[in-house]
């Protein structure tokens, strides 16, 4: 395994250099500041004052978490239900927040500009998101948006789509981070090509999720990847129940569902559930000190 890990490290070092040369740099201190600004903006008071704003439709389902934490698997399970549609990684939430940022450009940035949103604008943005998913799946009762990084936007999502459901996928931090490190995301996830950067991103993800879980009122279900692998039917029933859908056996045969999957896990979700990816990090343990030390208490 030493040889294969060395090859991964060389590839990641080269990729990081290439990204940095084109100005795509992950700066942990900037990321930490951005997460703190989200928490400061979407305070308990902010959310309380805007209760009942936005569009209350129960159609949107956001599956989010760290990349490579089981988001594609959970989406595929839900998409196997006859009344649900898997839309993949939609950019609509970031499109709406960028539009908000553009509106106040030069005066106030996102997320701080969210405090200027009126009740009518929140309803309008919620409707804009619904229009986008209705176009994709007019008949579906639930539409899954599995953009992992939406975990950063949960305060915004609650403000404009308070009736939506959030499924937060969790996976062992070492496996989750190593799986990112072993994946070439092409032009995204700039934090994933360096073990120290990955650890920094992961720590901030945990900090923000802990905050959302105690502050938000939107419905959130946490799904642990390893538990889903070990108790497939039990956890799948929990997911379908959370979505307020009737049970359907097709959700257990998710790997037979014919649909386009355009993410890094496309091949895995065509196989029945297995334990191959559980504790995979242990094979590479001797070379993961930077990651383990960076994760600290989370490792």
Please state what every model-predicted region is.
Residues 1-60, 110-141, 180-222, 230-299:
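PAPS-dependent sulfotransferases, especially Golgi type II membrane carbohydrate sulfotransferases
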Residues 50-161, 169:
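Phosphate-binding active sites in nucleotide-utilizing proteins
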């Amino acid at each position: 395994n030493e040889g294969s890990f060395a090859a991964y490290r060389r590839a990641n070092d080269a990729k990081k250099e290439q990204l940095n040369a084109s100005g795509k740099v992950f700066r942990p201190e900037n990321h930490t500041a951005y997460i703190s600004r989200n928490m400061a903006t979407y305070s308990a008071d902010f959310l309380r004052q805007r209760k009942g704003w936005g569009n209350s439709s129960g159609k949107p389902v956001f599956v989010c978490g760290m990349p490579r934490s089981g988001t594609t698997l959970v989406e595929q399970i839900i998409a196997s239900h006859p009344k649900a549609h898997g839309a993949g990684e939609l950019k609509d939430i970031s499109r709406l927040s960028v539009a908000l940022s553009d509106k106040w450009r030069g005066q106030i940035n996102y997320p701080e500009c969210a405090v200027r949103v009126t009740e009518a604008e929140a309803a309008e943005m919620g409707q804009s998101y619904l229009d986008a998913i209705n176009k994709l799946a007019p008949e579906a009762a639930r539409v899954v948006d599995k953009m992992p990084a939406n975990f950063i936007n949960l305060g915004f999502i609650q403000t404009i789509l308070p009736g939506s459901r959030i499924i937060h996928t969790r996976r062992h931090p070492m496996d989750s981070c190593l799986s990112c490190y072993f994946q070439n995301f092409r032009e995204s996830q700039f934090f994933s090509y360096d073990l120290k950067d990955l650890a920094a991103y992961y720590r901030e993800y945990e900090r923000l999720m802990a905050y959302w879980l105690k502050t938000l009122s939107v419905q959130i279900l946490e799904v642990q990847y390893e538990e889903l692998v070990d108790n497939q039917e039990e956890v799948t029933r929990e997911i379908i129940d959370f979505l307020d859908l009737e049970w359907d056996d097709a959700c257990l045969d998710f790997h037979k569902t014919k649909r386009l999957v355009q993410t890094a896990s496309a091949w895995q979700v065509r196989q029945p559930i297995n334990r191959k990816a559980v504790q995979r990090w242990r094979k590479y343990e001797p070379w993961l000190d930077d990651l383990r030390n960076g994760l600290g208490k989370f490792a």
